[in-house]
Structures are given as structure tokens and as C-alpha cells.
Amino acid sequence: MSTIEEKRHSLAHLLAQAILNIYPEAKLTIGPATETGFYYDVDFGTSKLTDQNLPKIEKEMKKLLPTWDTFESISKTADEAREYFKDNTYKLELIEEIISRGEQLTFYKSGDFIDLCRGGHVAHMNEIPADSFELDKTAGAYWRGDEKNSMLTRVYGLAFESKEELDVYKHKIEQAKERDHRKLGKELDLFTFSDLVGGGLPLFTPKGTAIRNAIIDKVYEIQGEYDTQEVCIPHITKPDLYKTSGHWDKFKDELFHVHGRENEFVMKPMNCPHHTQIFASKPRSYKELPLRYVESTMVYRDEQSGELLGLGRVRSITQDDGHTFCTPEQIDQEVKILISIIKKFYTLLGLMKEGNYRVSLSFRDPKEPQKYLGDESVWETAQAALTRIAQEENLPYEIFEGEAAFYGPKIDFMFKDAIGRERQLGTIQLDFNMPSRFGLEFTDKDGTKKTPVMIHRAIAGSLERFLSIAIEHFAGNFPFWMAPVQVALIPIKEQHEQAAKDLHKQLKALGIRVDYMNSNDNFGKRIKKAKDERVPYFIIIGDKDIEANKVTLESRDEGQLGQKSIEEVLQLFRELK
């Protein structure tokens, strides 16, 4: 039986033939399998293809399906290949690349269709049920992903083992559309964008800012238990900083350049090089270590406009950032501390449940030690420590050799959201490179100079991306501590407003985010507004409440909670905070 990847790859061929049958002047480029189906990038020339054209192409695919059987490997010489694709410059470019690498040209034929292909197809096309796939959408895509090249049309298809699996996936997609953070962000008045400000530069409203502050405050509250020290750095720097750190060669095309009166500056794309300079500002002793610097600050990356996506991919990025400077012997304890912080934070979000997360340990490739910086024994000690810690902390981990950065191994926490999508969030990264590049030193117990280890960590990571995930995970129904408005205070009529105002003062004194909805509007409209805004609790005050010296409490998640005394309500909110 063929794999789902082989089925998806085979369907990409079928899609290509269907396109040529309807658009014979189209130029095919490449068509791989994807995690959910397949696609083919096509140059349609003067023809314009939109989603409205997909049913016609899909119908042609299903008409062709029973006429195809197996995939046959076809041999062609270089000259034969060039002749066959003489009218397709894209295929010719691929052919020349394959030849230049000294690799063999391979072609596969099914039905009347022949394509340049490495292989990996079904044994027989009858393994693919006609109702297990469908065309999904079209999008623009540059040839080879380079914006300097031609713009092509990417035709996406979905494909699963059966119609049932396809339907389950489509249902998840519908859920995802309803939860889309761009849609909910607008409905809940959390953030906006402006053409005058620029793409990828979100503007947070008071409610969106309240959520951001709640997240940052919670991270600081948790990490504050571990003697962290808050630092603050400027948003621009001389290029020399990144030339020393080694980031210049990698990031120089993604930097925003600022020309001053005398010097050139760049907007910082990360914070770690700045933090090294705080460490380097005076002589350090082993007695000071570990030093745990933390900061919530913005960084800037000049992302391509086509890659921007709501809050998920932006140009101004708020990082919940931290860098620990420690001795190699302290790696174990420091990583455990960071895991503890991550566990506490994601437990609050309800994500730290068995079966809902996994941990990826990215290690160096032992077969290619020359690709990595730092002493081999330090790497081995660090990787052994990470493995041992993962076991001691009962983390569901996997080791991925060859996935480490050149400067150190790392731990990534992968969580499933409410509809089963896996999201990479918390990260712990060991760095043996940057301290050396900057000549960082501390005086050890024996009086010798040693180089510290640097540990990068992100709890929430990019706050914008985290918020996009949180909005979609909770569908706007944020937990009490995160909600932009935690309580809606609703007096029924004007005569109930004084009691509501008195309670409003008490709630504000507790630090509760309250929306006082006075009686100027219809009572029913105010209730609807509070529910539409997904406010966790409503407090209603009417005649019976004032007579009993109580209030009526309603929960978004639990429904009616009945009459409560003022002290009972205040105590509930103290505990929820």
C-alpha cells in the first residue's frame, strides 16, 4: 500500500495534466506533496486563474483518474530532455541544474503525461479514492521563491486517505476561519493596521494593550521568583555590534537602516548582542554567576510584504527575552529553572497537559563536528545534561540530531491548540559561540579567566505571534487573568448606579479591569455587548440586589451564579487574579 505522501505527489501529476488539458499554453514548473495535500506552480501566461476556475480543473482531474494506472520511469538523455521541454524555460532551468550537479535526469509517465520528477508515486492510481481529494485555493508564488523572478499561480489541493479524513480536516479549517485572530482581533477591538503606518506594524488598542500587559506581567511574576534582573537597551545600534556577533552576514538584508548625522545605525533585530555588552561592562567573578538578564522589548525585521500575516508575522516584534550567563557547571540548574518557568506559564494557559505537548531536543550532528563551534566535550556535556533534565522533568522528548544551531543545542516546546494545530512556543537555547566572539570572561575559583555559557530563552516568545495563537486557541474567550475586560458592571436602572459606582471603586482598587456600563443604554443591549466581548464575569445590580445588599453574578463559562455578597465577589476575584 502506498503512503499518503506518495498519493499526494501522484495527485500533483494528475493536477498538472488536468491544467494542460484545459490551458494548453500553461507552463508547468514544480509540484510537490504537502502536509495536507499537494500543489503545482504554473505560469498561465496571459490567462488569469482564480478560485472560480478550480471546480473545472478538479472535474477534469476526476475524469482523468480512472484512465491512469501506474507510474512508469522514463529515460531521457540531456539532449532529449532539453528537446522535450524546449518551450518551458522553467523545466529547462531545472534540467541544467540537475546536470550541473552530476545527477541523473529522471522522468515519470502516467496516462499521457510525462514530467521531470525524482519519483515517489503510488503503485497504482486506483489506490486513490476520487472523493478523497479536492482542489482548495490559488495563490501567487514567485519562481524559486525569489521576488526577482516571475510571479506564478500556485494551485493547492487537499488529499487524505479517505473522504472521512478529508471532511474532518475541512471541518478543522472552518473552525480555524472562525477563530482567525485577524477576524477576532477586529471584532474584539484588540489591534489594527494602518496603511499610513505600514504593513507588519500593528497598532494595539486599549483592550489589546491590556492583554499584552497581562501576558508580560505574568511572565515577569513567574520568572521573578528566580532572581532575574531586568535590563533595558536602546532600539538602535552601530552595525559593528552585529558584525562582531556574526549576525550581520545572516541578517543584514532584513535590517532597517538608520542614517544619523555622523554614523550609520540599524534597528535591532535581536537583543542578545546588546546584553553581552552589559555583562562586559565590568570585570566579573564566578561569585556573580549566574546572571539572569530579562527584558520585554521590541525588535525590528524587514520582512518581505508577502510574508506578513496579521500578528503571526510582523516587522515590529515584542520579545519576552532573557539571557543567562553562567558557568558550564551551572547549565543543569539554569535549564531546570527555565523549564519550571515555562511549565508554570503554560499550565496557566491549560496547555501543559499530557498528550498536548512535546519537547524537541535539537543536537549537533556527530558525523559533522566541524559544522559546530565550541569544545566537543562541552557539547557532549550539555547535550547529556539536556537529555537527563528532560528525563528528570518527565518531558515527552525526542532528539533531533543535526538540528542544533552552530553555536549550541536547544529545547523547543511544541503545544497543540484547541483545534489540534501544533505550535512552537517556549524555547531554551545554549550558546557557546557569542560569549567567545565578544571576549566575555569571568574570573573562576582558581583565579583563571573563563568564558561563560550564554543561555537564550523565550517564554512567550514574540508577543505578537503569541497573541495571535492565544486569540485563536481561546477563540477570544480569554482566561480571567488575561482578559482585556475581566468584569462587566451593569446597573439595571439609574437608581442602581450609585451602588454600582461604589463597587466599581472597590474592584479598581483590587486591580480588576472593569467595564462600567451605565444605564444610558438599554439593559438588554448592555448584556449583549458584554457577551459579544467575551467578558468572563458580569455583575448585575437591581432592586432586589440593593435590598439584600448583594449583587447578581454571572459567568461567561459557568452561567448564572446567583446572588453574592460584595465580599464574596471581591474574594472570588482576588483568587482568580
Q: Where are the model-predicted features located?
A:
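NTP/phosphate- and nucleic-acid-binding module
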Residues: 1-29, 34-577
